[in-house]
Amino acid sequence: MTRLTRPMVRSPISLPSTPSQLLHSASLSSSPSSPSLVQQSHSYHGDYFSIKPKLSLDFAHSSDNFSDESELENNSTSFVDDDDIVKVRETFDNISIDIGASNPFAKNKHQWSYSPITPYDIVDENHTITVSTPKTNSQLLYTTTSPQLPRKETLSLKFGPSTLKSTVSTSTSTSTSTSTGTNTETKTVTTAAKSTNFTLSMPNLQQHKFLLVDDNLINLKILNRILLKLYPKAQITQVLDSTKVAKLVEENEYDAVFIDIEMPVVNGVQIAQFIRSDVSKDDLTVIAVTTRNSKEDLALFEKTGIDYTFGKPLNYKLDFMANVIDEIIERRKGQMIKKSVSSVESGVSLCSKESTNTLLIA
């Protein structure tokens, strides 16, 4: 028994052709009486401050049912960092920093950056810093045995079977020895240690009185700053006019006078001659600070009574300047004490002679 099926024929859809029909169809589609149509509104009725917190949230946990957010949730992909830290470390020669547990200052040290060719060595007293690599177990050992200068520093660099050892001391010589049987190379390089330490080891806390004379204000301030580093408790008088020096020296007792040579009206040589002409000022130290440092000038300064001459600019080590000034002041004070003691002894001897003469006459 055959069953006949009737083919379905769709009725053609009539499109509106006139504007009135278009308006009528639009009103029917937007009428609330049609339950089959679902209205979706993409507009959010709120101000900017109410929507701003929602924008800062994660789309996966947002309670809004925006169509754009749903599309982002469906199309979102997780980004994975494909970089391997092992490969990155191998690229940079597997250099890692390891401060030994025996280092008492390990807690106070930060992780330092080392170059694989020329490591930055940290010099500390009585402790060691070790740089190790996990692949070859190579170590960079830097040890200092004495903090005093000149010091002997040993740098030992080990990479597997080969060893490079460098020793620095105060002499200049080079020696190299190679052993092919053990594949070990030892190279000793000895160079002269340079001393460029311009720091002061210990300032002098004596309350000295200094007089500075210079017609250049900048040079005067530079010398004043240096002397304050050497003698923090010193009383320093600065004078630009050299004609006032005579009165200041007569009315005050200074331990040292620092004078410039080339000055108008009264130069440094005339000031030194005036000071040395007074016997009571023999304990006063006179030091010249000038650019004139030829042999003839130095001979003239010594003949005039200037104790020492510092050349400009003052590129001397602070310890050197302090030692020179202290030595001259002590020598001048010692000579004055000897003169006073000798004068007292001569007076006592004269009194004793007079007393003996009176006794003999009696």
Swiss-Prot record:
InterPro entries: 2C_system_His_kinase, CheY-like_superfamily, Sig_transdc_resp-reg_receiver
Bias type Low complexity, positions: 19-39
Pfam families recorded: Response_reg (PF00072)
Record CDD domains: REC_hyHK_CKI1_RcsC-like
Region (Disordered): 1-39, 163-188
The UniProt record lists the keyword Phosphoprotein: yes
Modified residues (4-aspartylphosphate): 260
GO biological process: filamentous growth of a population of unicellular organisms in response to biotic stimulus; phosphorelay signal transduction system; positive regulation of filamentous growth of a population of unicellular organisms in response to biotic stimulus
Location of the Response regulatory domain: 209-327
Keyword presence, Manganese: no
Keywords of the record: Phosphoprotein
Superkingdom assignment: Eukaryota
Function: Required for stress adaptation, morphogenesis and virulence.
Protein name: Stress response regulator protein 1
Species this protein is from: Lodderomyces elongisporus (strain ATCC 11503 / CBS 2605 / JCM 1781 / NBRC 1676 / NRRL YB-4239)
